[in-house]
């Protein structure tokens, strides 16, 4: 019989007892609802722990999950995260940098001077295509604090387009950050979709 149980990822760092969640130990994460799920998501958000969604990381699945709710445009993803002070910023692919420069009517060199060197990574949804990346610092220089808007919104990087979804490098899944209400909504709806399509799958806490 195929084992339909998956081990939790980052969530295993969470001390359930410390947060009054000891009664959830051994529970199926995918089946949690109501106050228990709300308290767990709030706690994970406070600890900056993302949740893995056991769905293939495909454009269709990403768009499906993003459609479950709407971004509140709080702007928190555009500023430094106090729980992750070592974050280098917003990752931008080379072709995205060119689009941003064109949108701002500036040169690629000028934009490059605003960033730091990134790394070579597979392009999202195209694992055979490698691309250099750059890091935009936080707070993002294109974030307008009042009224929480973006100077490059039409050409914003893919990491901004799909936030709070995070690419993990695993084609079999992706993660969702839950330190905003939008992320919490997406997790609840994504888990409901997984339960509906794979009712035997379990992720034990």
Predicted regions, residues:
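Short loop/turn segments that flank or connect secondary-structure elements
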Residues: 1-205
């Amino acid at each position: 019989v195929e084992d339909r149980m998956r081990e939790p990822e980052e969530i295993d760092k969470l001390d359930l007892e410390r947060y009054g969640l000891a009664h959830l130990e051994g529970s199926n994460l995918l089946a949690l609802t109501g106050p228990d799920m709300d308290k767990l998501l709030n706690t994970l958000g406070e600890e900056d722990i993302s949740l893995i969604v056991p769905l293939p990381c495909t454009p269709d699945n990403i768009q499906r999950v993003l459609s479950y709710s709407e971004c509140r445009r709080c702007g928190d993803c555009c500023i430094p995260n106090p729980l992750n002070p070592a974050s280098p910023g917003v990752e931008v692919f080379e072709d995205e940098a060119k689009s941003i420069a064109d949108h701002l009517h500036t040169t690629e060199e000028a934009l490059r001077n605003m960033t730091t060197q990134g790394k070579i990574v597979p392009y999202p949804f195209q694992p055979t295509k490698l691309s250099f990346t750059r890091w935009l610092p936080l707070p993002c220089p294109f974030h307008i604090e009042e009224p929480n808007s973006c100077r490059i919104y039409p050409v914003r990087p893919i990491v901004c387009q799909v936030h709070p979804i995070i690419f993990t490098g695993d084609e079999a899944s992706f993660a969702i950050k839950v330190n905003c209400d939008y992320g919490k909504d997406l997790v609840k709806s994504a888990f409901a979709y997984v339960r509906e399509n794979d009712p035997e799958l379990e992720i034990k806490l």
